[in-house]
Amino acid sequence: MKSESHSGGLEPHVNSLALKAILVVDDDQQLASALQWILADENFLVDVAFDGEEALVKIAAHDYDVVICDLKMPKLQGDALYLRAREIRPSLEDRFIFITGYATDPIIRHFLIEQEVKFLVKPFPIGGLINCVRELLG
C-alpha cells in the first residue's frame, strides 16, 4: 500500500481580518479607488460604489462587515443610504463610518450626532480610517 506524506508545504495563513468585507461609497472615484487599494493592502475584501443607489443594490446583494460612506453624493445621499441600509440589513446599524468634508454643516452635524455614528472629516489620515475600521470589527 502506497503511503503519501505531506512534504511540509506552507499552509495558507489567514488573518482573521482578511475575510472581512468593506464597501466604500464615494462619488469621488479617485478617493474611492485609493481607499479600495489601501484597504485591500490591509487584507480586507473591498468593494466600491460611486453613488448611494449603487451602494444600496450592493448592500442588498452582499453581506458587508463595514461600510465607509461619503455623506454628500448624487442620487442618494449618505444619510438616506444609511437609513435604508439599516432596513435591509439591521446588522449594519453600527458598521458605518462616514467620511465628509461638511462636518460643520448643521444638518450633517445633527445627523452624525443623532445617529451616534463614527465619522472622519476629509481630509483624514489613512491610519485613522484603518484604526476606525479595526475598532468596528473589534
Where are these regions (language model features)?
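Non-catalytic signal-transmission and effector/linker regions of two-component phosphorelay proteins
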Residues: 1-21, 87, 109, 125-138
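Charged docking surfaces used in two-component/phosphorelay signaling
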Residues: 33-41
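Short hydrophobic/Thr-rich beta-strand motif most characteristic of the beta2 strand and flanking loop
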Residues: 43-50, 58
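Acidic catalytic/metal-coordinating carboxylates
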Residues: 50-54, 77-81
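Active-site residues of response regulator receiver
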Residues: 70
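Receiver (REC) domain active-site loop signature in two-component systems and cognate sites
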Residues: 73
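Alpha4 helix (beta4-alpha4-beta5 surface) of REC/receiver domains from two-component response regulators
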Residues: 80, 93, 102-121, 127, ...
